[in-house]
Amino acid sequence: MLATGSPECKGNDMTTRPAPQAGDAAARPAEKRRSSAPGPDSLPARVERESGMAPEQASPYMWMRAAAHASRAQLAERMNLSLRDDRRTEAKRVHYLSMEFLMGRALGNALAALGLHGEFDAAARAAGKQPGDILEVEADAALGNGGLGRLAACFLDSLATLGVPSFGYGLRYRYGMFVQRIHDGQQIEEPDDWLRHGNPWELERPEVRYPVGLAGRVVTDGSGRRWLPAEQLYAGAYDFIVPGHATERVAVLRQWQAYPSQPVDFAAFSRGDFAGAGAPMLAAEVINWVLYPDDSTHAGRELRLKQEYFLVSASVQDIVARHMADYGRLDNLGDKVSIHLNDTLPTLAIPELLRILIDLHGMTWDAAMAQCQKVMSYTNHTLMPEALETWPVSMLEHWLPRHLEIIYQVNDRFLKHLALHFPGDEALVRHVSLIDENGERRVKMAALSIVASHRVNGVSRLHSELMVQTIFADYARVFPDRFCNVTNGVTPRRWLAQANPALSATLDERLGPQWRIHLDQLAQLAPQAADPNLQRAVLAAKRANKERLAQLVRRDLGITIDPASLFDVQIKRIHEYKRQLLNALHVVARYQAIIANPDAPWQPRTVIFAGKAASAYATAKTIIRLIHDIARTVNIDPRVRDRLKVVYLPNYSVSLAENIIPAADLSEQLSTAGTEASGTGNMKFALNGALTIGTWDGANIEMAQAVGAEHFFIFGLHAEQVDEVRRLGYDPRLYYEENAQLKAVLDAIAGGAFSPGDPGRYRGLVDSLLNRDAYMLLADFAAYVSAQQRVDAMFATPEVWADKAIRNIAGMGGFSSDRTIRDYARTIWNVKVQ
């Protein structure tokens, strides 16, 4: 039952009882264990106690909060047991540092992991409540934004499910990134006040508190160099427990909250300077306000630096403190601790760890560097040089003077290594130095991550190959064995079992329920792909999901869409390289073709977009506005009727994705070949039976190889062809002049056909395509339109489409985040999995 009697644990290690042994209840799958709590501990009783109302009268929110608290109590007990078992076995721990964790809602996942969905549903219905209404009122945790954060969330799910001793470390953002509103087709950012009613899942840890310094100076004393910060904050911990599935193991996401060393300047307050009196509190609070603050200003860049350092300082102090409590020494740190950097945003963990080992614990430089390299590993997520993070030396010198000294020393020793092993190669030295001397001197965070880590991985085979051939080619010469590949994955618990219960029921009938933790069992579906009964079941599940999404669109946007139409979906961060604009160009081409030949047998299609643009990214915002202008024109044109609809769903989130992805027929994965590191949305769509139209890029390649390229709609230039076209001199205007359809599309957009009140609105956007086209949309346009024609023809034959949908599902077994974590555990972290 959803009982409330489990203790919420005390102390930094949160341990109050012996670790589970084989055969203990705590070592058995969750579904085999049930509480025998008496009536007063039931969920309705807890609803009544927390709301002061009868369960029948309590609101869905009160039901959600009570269910969350009851679930949290059971998860806290599992946390207690997991941490105690890790200490007993002296297991090596993984610590995953990430600026974002896009967790989504937690209640549905917790109920599934605890095996309590049935009891929750029954209790809610007995009180006259709809379980779905209760689940719906939970806010998405605004701790992330895009693929980087969602990958981190999937990893925590798999770390827990595979029993890997693990902590995630992030910041407790007060307002997330932003809520996206659309006004007159334009993105408007508003604070995401997701914590206004508190977070029923988090456990505050007032006993876990670390000082975090800023600015100041470095002095030399009898024990060496020592940093004397001019400012000091404190980091307080909030724990979010991530349950494993078919196990009682959990992972812990520890989020840091900044507090001032002195909350109020009382002297200023007494003088009547109330703003000055509150300045210390404001300086601390702003650290946690927003994920990825606008960095177009100096103040914004400084805030980002402070956020990154605050995260890593608190996290590394916590890791070292836990290790010292367990072992009392640091010479075995690399044997018991793994710190993984999710991109370069947490890279300051490297000089922070070295500072703690050398300055605070008296370790020699060589010993500290050896431990650091054993501990640290780094995942790269981009192939674009301009996206690699750097920090001005002057900014680090002001805010983190001791860390800059340490970075200089790492670089000095690295360059001496190069002089020894690559004598006379001055070009190599310039390229791989941690300091970029061109213009304003800057520290290259990716370079620091490579030099100070023992492993560096890409996230798809193509990405990892290109990584060592292009942006990190010189580092691969120096460290040929340091680079590896671990292809991304997604958790099937959320992205299939939770998001798509209709399809999951069909899979259970065919395979049994174990596919949730053994996703490779999906391969058993491939020989059944032509089975008419399976095809009917898969198509029926898809239709039910499309009807659900159509209701959401009608409710939120007032637009009626036909569930029988082809749902063509592109949902992801709005960025030029992801090429939502190419999709929009095809929509215009299709619209023009329908107008020109209205009596042709057009396949009805609903094109669905969702995604946020970074607040300072003007071009991405212009693309959003163009899509809305196209939608406004197409959707009201009586000549089009229901043969084409365009929908933009605002404020993209995990919960919205859980509604959209199961309903998609076609998954748009359009990145310019060689630019998308991996992608995970592509995997989620295919797992739910959508077919992919996409470029030969990122994980699309491995997915096509697993499923069979004949079951994909691959189009466009490959990465090597992109490079060759650029090398020969890419002229996008030639494509415009030679393709009448493309010319008509661009002329219509540039001429104001979709913005009659402001005819020049998109002239600059079109000019950028004609004169530069950095992501080669015009080069791929004709192939994309041709691939879309193949989509139409195939969708018109449901049994053929269903066959390919089933084969896509069957081929996704290798794209579980469980497989990904097993690969990390084996090739990078050297930890055991269950």
How would you describe each model-predicted region?
Residues 10, 15-834:
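A conserved ligand/cofactor-binding region detector
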Residues 1-13:
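Short, Lys/Arg-enriched N-terminal segments with co-localized hydrophobic residues
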